[in-house]
A protein has these predicted regions:
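Catalytic donor nucleotide-activated moiety binding site of glycosyltransferases and closely related
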Residues: 145-151, 183, 232-233, 237-274, ...
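Aromatic- and Gly/Pro-rich donor/ligand-binding loops
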Residues: 3-14, 18-165, 213-214
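Donor nucleotide-activated moiety binding/catalytic core segment of transferases
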Residues: 193-201, 205, 258-259, 263-291
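Charged active-site motifs of nucleotide-sugar-dependent glycosyltransferases
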Residues: 2, 142, 222-227, 251-252
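A donor-sugar binding/catalytic signature common to diverse glycosyltransferases
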Residues: 281-321
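Leloir-type glycosyltransferase catalytic cores
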Residues: 325-378
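A nucleotide-sugar donor-handling region in carbohydrate enzymes
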Residues: 94-106, 120-126, 147-225, 231-232
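Short beta-strand scaffold positions
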Residues: 114, 175, 289-290
Length: 378
């Protein structure tokens, strides 16, 4: 079967790309053909992307501030975009570039799938995009969603009405967060099959090591005594805590990020590395401090000691969801003067048992979903 997946693969961040790679790998392993639809909105790339971000920031009304923001932000965004475009071409199977709904309507497949990440939430411009609800797909084609996420838990009445209509056209829906299951149930949708794992967790550590990680990158960071910071939100408290934690524990602080401005936040800065080096940094870290959902997923999947700092916005529900699922809610930092979590060792025997059960269930969902088997709600 030919399966084409639309997901948020194009942002310049590691999680978006890694979950896309995992989705293709899993579907191919099930014996099907799979490609990521290379849908890249023009208002999210290059200078237009920076202007879109700027227009959503109400604090930049002053023309000089706007020019300064563009002058600083555009080169950073452009460099990261070039790097990630190169990685996408190297690691990801994609269709030809689609920049509009008209382009998407020309695609053909046996099944279209909405993939993971925050596909059903607002885009950079603040509005949802019906393309991620498969509104371009022909009526006679199967419409599926695996590990889709809303990115938030509250929508206005008009948006809910639109969502209910678009989601009702799907054959089967599986979502990533518990909060999404609650919403679908409240909206009266009957075509959802429950909560599933993020695609990155469908592959275990050894599979990721074989698929992505190069030996020279793994050796490069072996036996290094460091705390790794993977931060995606602008939270000065996180940056300050990580510096104090490293000093308290006597470990080196290493920070990895695709955005150059994080060089100012402390620690040895590794700027926009290849996926192999990124995963090697996680694999070798003694402890990880993160506010990132995928940073959390890979910390758990690689059996690492980690400290979770929830972001100060609605997106934190996805982090909480995977922590609850694996029994690791106690890794959430509640006090920025508390350094005890770095010494509190996680029992990964129990965690891996829970994760393996959920992995098997999720793999069965995606297998049955594509093969058009019957479902029972989980």
């Amino acid at each position: 079967m030919d399966v084409k997946v639309i997901t948020r693969h194009s942002p310049s961040n590691f999680g978006s790309l890694l979950q896309s790679i995992a989705t293709v790998h899993v579907i191919e392993r099930l014996g099907h053909q799979c490609e990521i639809i290379d849908y890249q909105r023009k208002d999210e790339r290059g200078l237009k992307g920076v202007l879109t971000q700027l227009n959503c920031k109400g604090s930049y009304g002053n023309p000089l501030k706007r020019l300064a923001y563009i002058a600083i932000r555009y080169p950073i965004e452009k460099f990261a975009q070039v790097k990630f475009d190169r990685m996408r071409k190297c690691y990801l199977k994609m269709t030809k570039r689609c920049s509009s709904h008209k382009d998407l309507a020309k695609l053909s497949a046996d099944a279209f799938m909405t993939g993971s990440d925050q596909v059903w939430g607002p885009m950079m411009n603040g509005y949802y995009d019906s393309a991620y609800f498969l509104q371009f797909a022909q009526d006679n084609v199967r419409k599926l969603a695996y590990a889709a996420s809303f990115g938030k838990t509250k929508f206005d009445a008009s948006t809910v009405a639109d969502y209910k209509k678009m989601l009702a056209s799907y054959d089967k829906i599986a979502v990533r967060e518990k909060s999404a299951v609650v919403m679908l149930d409240e909206w009266g949708l009957e075509n959802y099959v429950g909560q599933v794992l993020d695609p990155t967790l469908l592959l275990d550590k050894s599979e990721w090591m074989n698929l992505i990680i190069k030996k020279n990158d793994l050796v490069k960071y072996k036996d290094k005594n460091y705390i790794l910071v993977y931060q995606i939100h602008n939270d000065p408290k996180l940056s300050d805590y990580a510096k104090r934690l490293a000093k308290h524990s006597g470990m080196e602080l290493v920070r990895v990020n695709p955005m150059l401005h994080q060089i100012l936040r402390g620690g040895k800065f590794i700027f926009c590395p290849d996926l192999s080096e990124f995963l090697s940094l996680i694999a070798n870290a003694l402890c990880i401090v993160t506010d990132s959902f995928h940073g959390t997923c890979f910390s758990i999947n690689f059996g690492k000691q980690f400290i979770e700092i929830l972001p100060n916005n609605a997106t934190g529900t996805r982090n909480q969801s995977i922590l609850e699922l694996t029994g690791l809610s106690d890794r959430i930092l509640c006090d920025f003067n508390d350094y005890s979590l770095v010494d509190k060792v996680i029992d990964y025997g129990k965690v891996n048992e829970l994760l393996e059960v959920e992995r098997r269930k999720s793999l069965e969902v995606i297998r049955s979903m594509i093969q058009n088997s019957s479902f029972i709600k989980q």
